[in-house]
């Protein structure tokens, strides 16, 4: 297609909202002229289902709960006055608590002000807050955020080393809806131990974001933590960033949560439009459907040309893949849906995998994210009449053109700047697109049975570990994995036995010794003297 035809197609398919500055260009997606019209009936059905969801319908039937993350920025849309009041009260409490921390009326027991923030959470309880913190944070924020987002001991040690002697001025926020998530519990216990070793009383530094009556809620109440903020059962982890999960860490960091909520609210209004051509979330969902055949046939590569948006692809990985990656449709048919999401940032990726995107296997479509404003001030030229930001823009346009020359599809989202308002817009845009796409392909976007299966399997492994080590201690012998598995009456579990003991022997915690054999799997294990 020549440049004139491309320009005409660009003009025909460019979404632009003057109030927000949001733009969406779908012209480089190679859909046929009649595609949008052919999908209109399904799109209108998706709009209707979204309206029912926002009205309080049970959108997650296997869990019997509503899905109400849209109410978080428009409480007046909540199905009950009680929910609306709880949302408003929580946001106000967050503002007041953050102001008290910044003003010093809530401080460490010795009176020193809190200057660092440790957020303990995993999945949606970390990815959203991390994205917001990195996108909007500056060196002069009143609190500097750090994260325990895994149950990796070395990872937590590194974070504690970064905090260093400032632990006495560090406020810890533990985020878990149920309070039973093991990774978060482990992070909380590791943090508590670190405070204790420093001679500090952990409850006077701790805040909980959790469900009412949860295990974490009971712990925080009985121990006298500084504060507790709610997580409601109608907010899923991956869509919780505009709840206390994301707002409390952001407010403590000193970010403009009102601006973020306003941006999300504005985008929600845009994406409620029943006119498909004027609804950017619907256009996104339809482009996903076109690119993947509605069956996950292609991957989504997310390329934000802005360092502040580096973590957006990680955030979208969970939002999209955990929502859309489902074995069954809503009627119970096996469909194995999903869209794989990965990405880093431009123009870094010019020197990484863009080579394959242009010339390798064509199994993807690209989502470019463009930010018009380069920096807060003026830029000095790096060449006559050219700035570093001009180069960044040029690389985005050049990559888009180079991919198009090879028939590689892309769409481009443009925002005027990175700000609390535009970050809220991006979050809301993709939340809505995920929900609409799920309707188009007839799946439940709001549960995650595969995640639960993985948790149960991990629990089984840890239960076996206790039996394995107890058996070794009881026999006092040097045994192979096969011998231990047979003795436990589980000969088919020899691989689990071997891998469990391989890990145990590499660490001093369980007192296990390994005697390597020529064939590694024939190695013998025993208890250290």
UniProtKB/Swiss-Prot annotation:
Pfam families: PGI. Keywords: Cytoplasm, Gluconeogenesis, Glycolysis, Isomerase. GO terms for molecular function: carbohydrate derivative binding; glucose-6-phosphate isomerase activity; monosaccharide binding. Its main location: cytoplasm. It is found in: Cytoplasm. It catalyses: alpha-D-glucose 6-phosphate = beta-D-fructose 6-phosphate. Gene3D superfamilies: Glucose-6-phosphate isomerase like protein, domain 1 (3.40.50.10490). Pathway: Carbohydrate biosynthesis; gluconeogenesis; Carbohydrate degradation; glycolysis; D-glyceraldehyde 3-phosphate and glycerone phosphate from D-glucose: step 2/4. GO terms for biological process: gluconeogenesis; glucose 6-phosphate metabolic process; glycolytic process. Its EC number is 5.3.1.9. The active site is at 322 (proton donor), 351, 455. GO terms for cellular component: cytosol. The keyword Isomerase applies. InterPro entries: G6P_Isomerase (IPR001672), Phosphoglucose_isomerase_CS (IPR018189), SIS_dom_sf (IPR046348), SIS_PGI_1 (IPR035476), SIS_PGI_2 (IPR035482). Catalyzes the reversible isomerization of glucose-6-phosphate to fructose-6-phosphate. PANTHER family: GLUCOSE-6-PHOSPHATE ISOMERASE. Belongs to the GPI family. This is Glucose-6-phosphate isomerase. It comes from Geobacter metallireducens (strain ATCC 53774 / DSM 7210 / GS-15).
């Amino acid at each position: 297609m020549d440049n004139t035809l491309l320009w005409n197609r660009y003009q025909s398919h460019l979404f632009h909202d003057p109030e927000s500055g949001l733009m969406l260009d779908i012209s480089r997606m190679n859909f046929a002229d009649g595609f949008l019209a052919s999908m209109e009936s399904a799109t209108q059905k998706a709009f209707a289902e979204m309206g029912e969801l926002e009205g309080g319908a049970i959108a997650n039937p296997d869990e019997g709960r509503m899905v109400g993350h849209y109410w978080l920025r428009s409480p007046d849309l909540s199905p009950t006055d009680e929910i609306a009041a709880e949302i408003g009260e929580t946001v106000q409490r967050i503002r007041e608590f953050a102001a008290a921390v910044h003003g010093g009326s809530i401080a460490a027991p010795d009176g020193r002000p809190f200057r660092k923030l440790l957020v303990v959470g995993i999945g949606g309880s970390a990815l959203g807050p991390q994205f917001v913190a990195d996108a909007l944070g500056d060196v002069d924020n009143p609190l500097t955020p750090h994260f325990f987002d895994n149950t990796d001991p070395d990872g937590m040690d590194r974070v504690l080393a970064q905090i260093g002697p400032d632990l006495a001025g560090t406020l810890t926020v533990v985020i878990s809806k149920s309070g039973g998530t093991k990774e978060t519990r482990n992070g909380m216990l590791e943090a508590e131990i670190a405070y204790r070793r420093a001679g500090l009383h952990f409850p006077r530094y701790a805040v909980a974001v959790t469900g009412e009556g949860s295990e974490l809620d009971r712990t925080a109440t009985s121990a006298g933590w500084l504060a507790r903020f709610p997580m409601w059962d109608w907010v899923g982890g991956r869509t919780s960033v505009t709840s206390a999960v994301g707002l409390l860490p952001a407010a403590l960091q000193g970010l403009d949560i009102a601006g973020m909520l306003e941006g999300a609210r504005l985008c929600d209004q845009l994406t409620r439009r029943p006119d498909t051509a004027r609804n950017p979330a619907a256009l996104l969902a339809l482009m996903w459907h076109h690119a993947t055949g509605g069956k996950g046939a292609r991957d989504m590569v997310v390329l934000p040309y802005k360092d502040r948006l580096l973590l957006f692809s990680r955030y979208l990985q969970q939002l999209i893949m955990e929502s859309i990656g489902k074995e069954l449709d809503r009627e119970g048919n096996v469909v194995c849906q999903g869209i794989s999401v990965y990405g880093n940032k431009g123009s870094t990726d010019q020197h990484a995998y863009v080579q394959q995107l242009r010339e390798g296997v064509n199994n993807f479509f690209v989502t470019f994210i463009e930010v018009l404003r380069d920096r807060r001030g003026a830029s000095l030229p790096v060449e006559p009449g050219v700035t570093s930001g001009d180069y960044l823009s040029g690389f985005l346009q050049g990559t888009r053109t180079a991919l198009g020359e090879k028939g590689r599809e892309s769409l481009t989202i443009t925002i005027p700047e990175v700000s609390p308002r535009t970050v809220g817009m991006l979050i809301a845009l993709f939340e809505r697109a995920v929900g609409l796409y799920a309707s188009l392909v007839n799946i439940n976007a709001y549960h995650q049975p595969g995640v639960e299966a993985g948790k149960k399997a991990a629990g089984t492994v840890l239960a076996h570990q206790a039996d394995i080590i107890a058996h070794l201690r009881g026999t006092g012998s040097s045994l192979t994995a096969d011998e231990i598995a047979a003795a436990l009456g589980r000969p088919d579990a020899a691989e689990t036995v071997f891998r469990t003991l391989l890990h145990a022997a590499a660490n001093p915690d369980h007192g296990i010794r390994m005697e390597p054999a020529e064939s590694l799997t024939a190695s013998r294990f025993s208890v250290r003297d």
